[in-house]
Swiss-Prot record:
It is found in: Host membrane. This is Protein UL148A. It comes from the Viruses. The gene is UL148A. GO terms for biological process: symbiont-mediated suppression of host innate immune response. Its main location: host cell. It is a single-pass membrane protein. Plays a role in the down-regulation of the host NKG2D ligand MICA by utilizing the lysosomal pathway for its degradation. In turn, MICA reduction diminishes NK-cell killing of HCMV-infected cells. Keywords: Host membrane, Host-virus interaction, Inhibition of host innate immune response by virus, Membrane, Transmembrane, Transmembrane helix, Viral immunoevasion. GO terms for cellular component: host cell membrane; membrane. The chain crosses the membrane at residues 10-30.
Length: 80
C-alpha cells in the first residue's frame, strides 16, 4: 500500500477550506470597501464637517451655486 492513499480523503477537505477562506476574505474586503464608500458619500452629501473635527454641520443644497469667493481646500485623510 502506498502512503499517498492516506491523504486522499483530506484533499477535498483542504480544497473546500481554502476556497471558503478565499471567498470569505474577498467578501469581507468588498463589504468594507462598500461601507467606506457609503460613509464617504454620506459625509459629502451632508457636508459633514464634524468628520473633519469642526464644530458645525451645514446641509448641502443641490440647486445652490457656490459663492464666488469659494476656494479649494485640501481634505485630510481623517475625513475618510
Amino acid at each position: 500500500m502506498s502512503s499517498d492513499s492516506n491523504f486522499d480523503p483530506w484533499i477535498p477537505v483542504c480544497v473546500v477550506v481554502v476556497m471558503t477562506s478565499v471567498v470569505l476574505f474577498a467578501g469581507l474586503h468588498v463589504y468594507l470597501w462598500y461601507v467606506r464608500r457609503q460613509l464617504v458619500a454620506f459625509c459629502l452629501e451632508k457636508v459633514c464637517v464634524r468628520c473633519c473635527g469642526k464644530d458645525e454641520t451645514t446641509p448641502l443644497v443641490e440647486d445652490a451655486e457656490p459663492p464666488a469667493e469659494l476656494e479649494m481646500v485640501e481634505v485630510s485623510d481623517e475625513c475618510y
